[in-house]
Amino acid sequence: MKTDVIVVGAGLFGSIAAKALAQAGLAVVGVDDSRPGAGSLPAACLMKPSWFSSMGKDKFEPSLELLDRIYGVKDISFKVGLLRATVHWCDPAQILGDEEVPVYREKVTALTRTSSGWAVSLEGREAALEARSVVVAAGVWTSELVRSQALGGLVGRAGVAFRWQDMQLEEQFISPWAPYRQTVGFNISPTEVWVGDGSAIKPENWNQDRQNVSYSRCAQAIDRAGFGDQEAGRVKALYGIRPYIAGVKPCLLEEVEPGLWALTGGAKNGTISAGWAASELVRRIK
């Protein structure tokens, strides 16, 4: 099969890039092996201006424009201490559940340069997929397929968020609990509440005790501590490993070889970074 662009990775970065390229008129397919621990799993896709203002207007304005055009950006009012703040939001279910771009749910085993672009070999499939361009947006696993000096600094940070079923908050909130960390709670759907505490732990140090501490902090923030919600199956833990690259902002977008792109490293600003990267790919892949 031949196409214009193959996007490896169907998390936030890959999904947003694939949809933007498809809407720009390119033929796009995705590949994702549904690996446990993907960084997008706990994502809420909240974008508070103070979190991303250091990107600069030249990056966050094109990002917000693209995200609003292809998904619709909503504004949510949060209580922040004694003040209120408006936070931009895209529904992660809409991004990750979009079906405009077909996705092969298989593992990539090799990327091979061809005379007309790139061949992507898939596990258990004899014929490779072929495209003029390949974007590898595989989070912390991007370096398994792409070599780049910048990817040498790629590390993962584990964290968890929680979704309470059959519940709504009267007041959506952002509350600091430690330097550079905040507990955030909001109504992510008409029947669910999302709460996260910003934990960012080395994956090898993550364990059930860490998750229990995070759960306790989140449950206390919404006055659900001691109600037995976990035992009753009323709350779901969403674990993921976010990709970080020190000194790279807002993320890594690099054409490592002609037609082969590495895209990762969004850290805690994944959605706004993904929007910028997608706008750049639309501009640079013809």
Swiss-Prot record:
Q: Name one GO molecular function term.
A: lyase activity
The Gene Ontology biological process terms listed for this entry are: symbiont-mediated evasion of host restriction-modification system; symbiont-mediated suppression of host innate immune response
Which reaction does this chain catalyze? Answer: 5-N(alpha)-glycyl-dTMP in DNA + A + H2O = 5-aminomethyl-dUMP in DNA + glyoxylate + AH2
Query: Which InterPro entries does the record cross-reference, listed alphabetically?
Result: FAD-dep_OxRdtase (IPR006076), FAD/NAD-bd_sf (IPR036188)
- Please provide the record's keywords in A-Z order: Host-virus interaction, Inhibition of host innate immune response by virus, Lyase, Restriction-modification system evasion by virus, Viral immunoevasion
Q: Name one Pfam family in it.
A: DAO
Question: ATP-binding: present as a keyword of the record?
Answer: no
Q: Does the keyword NADP feature in the UniProt annotation? A: no
Gene3D superfamilies cross-referenced by the UniProt entry:
D-Amino Acid Oxidase, subunit A, domain 2 (3.30.9.10), FAD/NAD(P)-binding domain (3.50.50.60)
What is the stated purpose of this protein? Catalyzes the cleavage of the N-Calpha bond of glycine in Nalpha-GlyT to produce 5-aminomethyl-2'-deoxyuridine (5-NmdU) on DNA as a step in the pathway leading to thymidine hypermodifications in the viral genome. As a final result of the pathway of hypermodification, 5-acetylaminomethyl-2'-deoxyuridine (5-AcNmdU) substitutes for a subset of thymidines in the viral DNA. These modifications probably prevent degradation of viral genome by the host restriction-modification antiviral defense system.
State the name under which the record lists this protein.
Answer: Flavin-dependent lyase
- Species source reads Pseudomonas phage PaMx11
